[in-house]
């Protein structure tokens, strides 16, 4: 019962903070705003989180994990139906992330450019990442650097998406997407 109550309070604060961060922005949201929306005492906040930025990191990790997992799982489904070369898998994976972030621009208020936070954050994410890396190795990639390569790809995509989707500068996503795909293909070949 006590554990369940603690989980409810934590979830309530995470949900309240997520809503506030995506609507107002992190800098414009105070801890007072969060506890008021979550209907908990301010002291309760500090039992669960060091400060507002600890909360931001946890939400960013959770959200980036969800995006990456969704992309990798969708890629797995697509490959079961229609096997594809690794470079095509990369484009599929990146396309999914781009489309998701274009549909959920407000996530950039939390994620900023840090999409890779969730890459190896959970066992499920690690397993999905390993499946992706197996494809890289199967096509001649170095097993010792497969996870590093995935990290670099996600970092590059996250930073590019932030600039092109959230800021629309120096290029929009439509303008930069072909160059991004060319660069990604060159990196893994």
Kindly give the residue locations of the regions a language model identified.
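Short hydrophobic/aromatic patch on the recognition helix
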Residues: 39-49
């Amino acid at each position: 019962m006590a554990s369940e109550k603690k989980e409810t309070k934590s979830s309530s604060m995470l949900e309240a903070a997520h809503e506030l961060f995506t609507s107002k922005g992190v800098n414009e949201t105070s801890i007072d705003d969060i506890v008021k929306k979550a209907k908990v005492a301010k002291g309760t906040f500090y039992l669960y989180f060091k400060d507002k930025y600890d909360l931001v990191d946890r939400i960013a990790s959770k959200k980036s994990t969800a995006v990456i997992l969704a992309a990798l799982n969708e890629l797995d489904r697509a490959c079961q139906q229609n096997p594809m070369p690794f470079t095509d898998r990369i484009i599929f994976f990146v396309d999914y992330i781009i489309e998701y972030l274009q549909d959920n621009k407000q996530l950039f208020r939390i994620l900023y450019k840090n999409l890779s936070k969730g890459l190896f954050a959970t066992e499920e994410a690690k397993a999905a990442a390993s499946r992706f890396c197996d494809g890289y190795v199967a096509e001649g990639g170095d097993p010792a650097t497969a996870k590093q390569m995935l990290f670099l790809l996600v970092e590059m995509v996250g930073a590019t998406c932030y600039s092109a989707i959230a800021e629309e500068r120096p290029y929009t996503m439509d303008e930069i997407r072909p160059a991004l795909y060319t660069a990604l293909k060159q990196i893994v070949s």
